[in-house]
């Protein structure tokens, strides 16, 4: 999914990036990329998450009680519902 995102992003940048007078394509694209994502980290970012995501996960894992951890999906986080399963079923369907 991330690879498709980057291909689409680079196609859009190549089409829409304004070039300054006598500038190179890299100078126009450089302003559109986040500060922590350099060309050296582009390939690594395709297979791993960005540092800010890892820091968020590290803070969530240090939460003392499992029921107090946040549930994150598509960068939206909210408290986990409690309980995840009904207690009256006792493992039966």
Curated annotation (Swiss-Prot):
Major location (coarse): secreted
GO cellular component, one term: extracellular region
Localization per record: Secreted
Keywords assigned: D-amino acid, Disulfide bond, G-protein coupled receptor impairing toxin, Secreted, Signal, Toxin
Keyword Secreted (UniProt): yes
Signal peptide segment: 1-22
Biotechnology: Given that the SSTR2 is an important pharmacological target for the treatment of acromegaly and neuroendocrine tumors, this peptide has potential as a therapeutic for the treatment of these disorders.
Tissue specificity of this protein: Expressed by the venom duct.
Cystine residue pairs: 72-77
Propeptide residue intervals: 23-69, 79-93
Record-listed D-tryptophan modification sites: 74
Keyword Signal included in the entry's annotation: yes
Molecular functions (GO terms): toxin activity
Domains as described in the record: The cysteine framework is C-C.
Function in brief: Potently activates human somatostatin receptors (SSTR) with a specific activation of SSTR2 (EC(50)=2.6 nM).
Family to which the UniProt record says this protein belongs: Belongs to the conotoxin C superfamily. Consomatin family.
Further information: Consomatins evolved by gene duplication of a 'Somatostatin and related peptides (SSRP)' gene expressed in the snail neuroendocrine system. In addition, this peptide adopts nearly identical conformations as in the somatostatin drug analog Octreotide. As this drug, it contains a D-Trp at the same position, whose synthesis is a common strategy used for enhancing the metabolic stability of compounds in drug design.
Protein name (record): Consomatin G1
